[in-house]
Amino acid sequence: MIVAVGSTNPVKVEAVRRAFSLFWEADVRGVDVESGVPKEPFGPNAIEGARNRARNALRALNADFGVGIEGGIFHLFGKYYCAGFVWIERKDGVHSTGMSGWFECPEAFLPDMLRGRELGDLMARLSGNENIKREEGAIGFFTRGAVKRVDLYTHGTLMALAKFIAAGRWPR
């Protein structure tokens, strides 16, 4: 089975590899595709970006599954949260979605993010690590490595895989 990930970010590719390998033998490949949304998407834009990445990756590699992971900012109950939205689409058009765990977005970052700055850029400045979004991520920095970005995205991918894992047990 070929699984196309709509990103070459090693964190996203590894998260998908970890999730799929729990259930199937999968050849997981990252491919550079367009998300069609702003670099730091808010709310529905993150969902749209994940969908676009999954579909574009599926087509680009003629894969069995396409996976799009889009980190974004979500506003609920008066606060902003960072999370990863995951869209998985099978080659027959059936899709499923999931999300990673959420964590509160630092309020100090919000003015810059609302103007289009990416969380990864702000974290690079704060941490001194220019590659933080391709490594531990903001959550890894803030939890001192207890939870890493790959963990969040593996969790989100598993949530999106539930429909496919359940197969005949998924209610119609």
From Swiss-Prot:
Binding site for Mg(2+): 34
GO molecular function: ITPase activity; metal ion binding; nucleotide binding; ribonucleoside triphosphate phosphatase activity
Entry keyword Metal-binding: yes
Cofactor detail note: Binds 1 divalent metal cation per subunit; can use either Mg(2+) or Mn(2+).
Claim: Metal-binding is one of the keywords in the record: yes
Cofactor(s) needed for function: Mg(2+); Mn(2+)
Residues that, per the record, bind substrate: 7-12
Catalytic activity annotation: XTP + H2O = XDP + phosphate + H(+); ITP + H2O = IDP + phosphate + H(+)
GO BP annotations listed: nucleotide metabolic process; thiamine metabolic process
Domain of life, per lineage: Archaea
Keywords: Hydrolase, Magnesium, Manganese, Metal-binding, Nucleotide metabolism, Nucleotide-binding
Its EC number(s): 3.6.1.73
Family matches, as InterPro entries: ITPase-like_fam (IPR029001), Non_canon_purine_NTPase (IPR002786), NTPase/PRRC1 (IPR026533), YjjX_NTPase (IPR050299)
UniProt subunit comment: Homodimer.
HAMAP family given in the database record: Non_canon_purine_NTPase_YjjX (MF_00648)
UniProt family annotation: Belongs to the YjjX NTPase family.
Protein role: Phosphatase that hydrolyzes non-canonical purine nucleotides such as XTP and ITP to their respective diphosphate derivatives. Probably excludes non-canonical purines from DNA/RNA precursor pool, thus preventing their incorporation into DNA/RNA and avoiding chromosomal lesions.
Protein name (database record): Probable inosine/xanthosine triphosphatase
Organism: Korarchaeum cryptofilum (strain OPF8)
